[in-house]
Swiss-Prot record:
Pfam families: TIM (PF00121). It comes from Pyrobaculum arsenaticum (strain DSM 13514 / JCM 11321 / PZ6). The keyword Magnesium does not apply. Belongs to the triosephosphate isomerase family. Substrate binds at residues 9-11, 146, 181, 202-203. Keywords: Cytoplasm, Gluconeogenesis, Glycolysis, Isomerase. It is found in: Cytoplasm. GO terms for biological process: gluconeogenesis; glyceraldehyde-3-phosphate biosynthetic process; glycerol catabolic process; glycolytic process. NCBIfam families: PRK04302.1, tim. The gene is tpiA. CDD domains: TIM (cd00311). One of its GO terms (molecular function) is triose-phosphate isomerase activity. The active site is at 93 (electrophile), 141 (proton acceptor). The lineage of its organism: Archaea, Thermoproteota, Thermoprotei, Thermoproteales, Thermoproteaceae. This is Triosephosphate isomerase. It comes from the Archaea.
Length: 224
């Protein structure tokens, strides 16, 4: 996994359904190539294979609930995500929380499959526990700020700084990124100044009227 990175989570937004997911992913890819920065996209499971076939930038799954392919009706298996073209997986988002034993299994299996692994956590202490599982990155996201436009880098900078310091002290090989309420390039720049190695965001990019221009704004701070 390359850093610094901008990860765009499409969630299940109507604005990123079907071919629209490909359009946003291609806008992200265009920005990544023009600036020479790292951008990954996380489309809904329904669009993951289509997006992965359409772009060269990393495509991440938004989550998983089964380790291996098999008789698991209506479930998503890590092995199948790999076959669909996923380069990585986001785990334990506040909108899709996992039990610790599940999280530990999924992190281990994803690493075994060669997938990038990003584990979300709400606070510094939980981030440290997540880092102990061995993901490539921990994304600290206070859930009360997600989708509010109140950027964690401005409204809870102490949470970000504490997480960066705590994880660096005990698990220096695990990167810390952040998210929640990120709306602008200034928010991204502030997050990087706090010591993070990237940002995870959703609505600011997905719901933008001009995806290319918005992603360009959000990605430019990665150059500094």
């Amino acid at each position: 996994m390359k850093f610094p990175v901008l990860i765009l989570n499409f969630k299940a937004y109507a604005e990123a359904a079907g071919r629209r997911a490909v359009e946003i992913a291609k806008a992200a890819e265009r920005v990544a190539k023009e600036l020479g920065v790292n951008i990954a996209v996380a489309p809904n499971h329904l669009e993951l294979a289509l997006v992965a076939q359409s772009v060269e930038i990393p495509v991440y799954a938004q989550g998983v609930d089964v380790e291996s392919p098999g008789a698991h009706t209506a479930h998503v298996a890590l092995g199948n995500l790999k076959e669909a073209g996923a380069a990585g997986v986001i785990l334990n988002h506040s909108e899709a929380p996992l039990r610790l034993n599940e999280l530990a299994r999924y992190v281990g299996k994803a690493r075994e499959l060669g997938l990038d692994v990003v584990v979300c956590a709400p606070d510094p202490t939980t981030s440290l526990a997540a880092a102990a599982l061995g993901p490539h990155a921990v994304a600290v996201e206070p859930p009360e700020l997600i989708g509010t436009g109140r950027a964690v880098s401005r409204y809870k900078p102490e949470t970000v700084v504490q997480t960066v310091q705590l994880v660096a002290k005990h698990f220096a090989d695990v990167a810390v990124i952040t998210g929640a309420g990120i709306e602008s390039g200034e928010d991204v720049e502030a997050a990087l100044r706090l010591g993070t190695r990237g940002v995870l965001l959703a609505s600011a990019a997905v719901k933008a009227k001009d995806h290319y221009q918005k992603i360009m704004e959000l990605a430019k701070p990665l150059l500094k």
